[in-house]
């Protein structure tokens, strides 16, 4: 078949490079770097490697703001995943990754391959994946297409995670109209590693072979990285070829084989990296660039599952379940023998060179020859103009929303039926969250917890972000996202260690959007510094807009914490009647950005809830101390729906009730004031708990009751609700909406 690729002249004159994702100035920069016009393959290499998805060219100035260091950090940003130290020679590797655009076009495969990709990132570090989480955003469940997206995305996550045998243990889902045509699918993987086994994605040692392992290369996913770096349109729905297809059973074999190599052949393994976004070109050029080396690849040797593939297609394909290894000379047969035991191909496709060039050979001809750093390191970095949106000042000056609360119990029931608040059991029951048998706290509490085998320790993990707060005030909302994640870890008995961030925003070329990105990063950074949770990995997903309509700023925070002793594991549900109920933190009339405002006004506006990071840190440390001293029976973070929702949720599991008198007016029952915790303690621990919390804003509210009635009083006012009725509404809402 003749090669019909455009000539260098056609690429320039017809501006074909623009269709591939390069701007005029970027194309001119490539010409300047090469001292000539790039051919079609070279233009393709630069277009994907200089995409936002691979180069972070728009977000780098913002990412530099994040604190990335701490005594607990074993590996910060720059590798497949970040790693924190948990003692005993062990580390926890984790990262969040987005697969937003593919999940709108092809929701099952888009979500499934997002899971597969993040798993490979974690095991490429040498870590065994032990848990998956996800953070999902959809439009309102009022159209068949919205229901289809939810069902298919969840099925894709479940299909891949369940098949590969990694438990999906937690996550969050929010529903808002801005996500109708811009769903967000962020997957997080957590792995356990012996510190001595930490790997690097590098190709060094002149003459060392580079080996391709795993599935054969097809034409799926070509320009997937570019596809994820442009604004979406209705026509974009036709770009199904940019969505990859996953095979979890192949990935399971690849995972076990790679971990075998790392464990048993670390002396001959130089580096290992996943072929993710931008496929072979990304992994190979990054590995060489990190090592200060060059690379020569023979494309004829790349395993192919389709006929007549061009070097361009092989390099840019995002076919799944593929890894790239660099091994020491003379040991290829050993590596091949190991992979053959798993029925996997392991093929030498090139070698490390000393000239810092990225040379591609096909049919004996050099088809691309460019400086490797130009691809992997030297993408232009843009300092985008930033402008405060007009809405921000309007929100600051707006009269506060006052909810209609004539029928408090009626509002309570309505809130529990909102899909963002309602039980997600219908969704998480599709996930196998008990596989591997180490899940200590299953989905449905504040954080998931997975035991560390052979120790008394456990890992607490969560994903969090209330994007409505970020829409009102991205700096405050960014800080709240980190604070809430830490609250969830602490409520579960864990000490927060570090975060991974999935930065989902609209089009950064709009100054108002870039302002959101900058301010959100400022808020995240401030909270991470105060709470000592450095950013050790992450992902940026921009251009989440369709036909000019963008999402709320949605920086998903994935956080991991250490539970020092299994005895410290704490859940949100009340345990025994007679236990004493306390509220930590102050409740104010803060409804802007709340579920209640959305319910009653049909929109979000006003000033975001206040957050005092000093107070937040103090309350978290006090509560964690109380948990570690064995004083706490249950602990629950107050989030969407405020006190009323948290109190109801605490009664549901055991079907208990509560009799409480609150220090705030009943119309503030659903306020979303920050830095609050609902805690229950056994009567014999009440005095010790109260003494520990002395001088703080901690209120004794009442007791857990045996009947299934919740009574809430303030002075002369009282409301009463049946636990069973509230639970029925809460559990039935999402199955009903998805019908």
Curated annotation (Swiss-Prot):
Gene3D superfamilies: PurM-like C-terminal domain (3.90.650.10), PurM-like, N-terminal domain (3.30.1330.10). InterPro entries: PRibForGlyAmidine_synth_PurL, PurL_linker, PurM-like_C_dom, PurM-like_C_sf, PurM-like_N, PurM-like_N_sf. The active site is at residues 53, 99. Substrate binds at residues 98-101, 120, 244, 318-320, 541. Mg(2+) 2 binds at residues 121, 274. It catalyses: N(2)-formyl-N(1)-(5-phospho-beta-D-ribosyl)glycinamide + L-glutamine + ATP + H2O = 2-formamido-N(1)-(5-O-phospho-beta-D-ribosyl)acetamidine + L-glutamate + ADP + phosphate + H(+). GO terms for cellular component: cytoplasm. The keyword Nuclease does not apply. Belongs to the FGAMS family. NCBIfam families: FGAM_synth_II, PRK01213.1. Part of the phosphoribosylformylglycinamidine synthase complex involved in the purines biosynthetic pathway. Catalyzes the ATP-dependent conversion of formylglycinamide ribonucleotide (FGAR) and glutamine to yield formylglycinamidine ribonucleotide (FGAM) and glutamate. The FGAM synthase complex is composed of three subunits. PurQ produces an ammonia molecule by converting glutamine to glutamate. PurL transfers the ammonia molecule to FGAR to form FGAM in an ATP-dependent manner. Monomer. Part of the FGAM synthase complex composed of 1 PurL, 1 PurQ and 2 PurS subunits. This is Phosphoribosylformylglycinamidine synthase subunit PurL.
